[in-house]
Amino acid sequence: MTLRRLRKLQQKEEAAATPDPAARTPDSEVAPAAPVPTPGPPAAAATPGPPADELYAALEDYHPAELYRALAVSGGTLPRRKGSGFRWKNLSQSPEQQRKVLTLEKEDNQTFGFEIQTYGLHHREEQRVEMVTFVCRVHESSPAQLAGLTPGDTIASVNGLNVEGIRHREIVDIIKASGNVLRLETLYGTSIRKAELEARLQYLKQTLYEKWGEYRSLMVQEQRLVHGLVVKDPSIYDTLESVRSCLYGAGLLPGSLPFGPLLAVPGRPRGGARRARGDADDAVYHTCFFGDSEPPALPPPPPPARAFGPGPAETPAVGPGPGPRAALSRSASVRCAGPGGGGGGGAPGALWTEAREQALCGPGLRKTKYRSFRRRLLKFIPGLNRSLEEEESQL
């Protein structure tokens, strides 16, 4: 049963309970009476709906269990009265309702049976510390328990003396000097619970700070062992992890795309691979040789001392008889250095792409600009030219 059906049912009951004026006056048709406004269901039907006050008065006749069941089935709520919004009672604004006065009586050789503790509450808004004395423990079958004292009660006064703000030792002396009868005014609130939660929060913050320091230390050790890096800023670790994942996904890290087999493809020029040095000038070097099919008359220059590749460059064999003079061979050296001169790890994708394009040694290979005419001349004199790869390795 929904709230709308309850309204209709209430209107029908009111219509049945109200007597019809035409039935009481038989001669109403001959002598029409003056229209008298009477409250009833027709007036209620003329309006869009009954007001909230009338609806509350109508719903009071129903049993609460039936009304709650109908509201639970329909999923509706009761209409709100204007000007009477529901408000939670703030217990901190009415402390007088929580105050209670207890009288404790004991024998000469007996104790009151409760323990107190003084705690300082820090108010950040007011920049002050409030000292609160509360009951931390009540013994079983003691005069304090029989009087109704409970753990958590804040002591406001002792024997009519206000003890708020008094030191702990002075409160203890006042209680001991009271004799066998003690009159306590207590206040039960949430201040003690707040103090306990605040202390636990500070403990958790301290633990979090210590664990975070251990985590940063482990991250530094991991990066030092895996990558050989020593970074003081822990924020760089996220960048390193993202770059490494991107390089692995694109297949640009060593191992995912070997650079050596790419240089040894049949039908393409051979050359050196990456230089094996662990210093800051570690980079990628590659040399391409171009020559004619005719055997050369002079042997090629010796390979450079600092270049480590998969093997020496292939040169055509010298024929047994004299032949025409062979064309001069050209060599080009390309240096692809990573940012920062890092040696062990992978280089960025742009540099590896440039190295692969240079490894293909296409016809449109751009010549390197030399700094002097002497170097350009020595390049075309076999036997006199120095290794360009060795010169580039010093940069």
UniProtKB/Swiss-Prot annotation:
Q: Which Gene3D superfamilies match?
A: 2.30.42.10
Q: Does the keyword Cell membrane apply?
A: yes
Major localization class: cytoplasm
Which stretches make up the PDZ domain?
101-190
Here the segments flagged for biased composition (Low complexity) are 16-33
State the InterPro entries in the record: Intracell_Traff_Signaling_Reg (IPR052122), PDZ (IPR001478), PDZ_sf (IPR036034)
> What's the protein here called?
Protein TAMALIN
Q: Which organism is it from?
A: Homo sapiens
Gene encoding this polypeptide?
A: TAMALIN
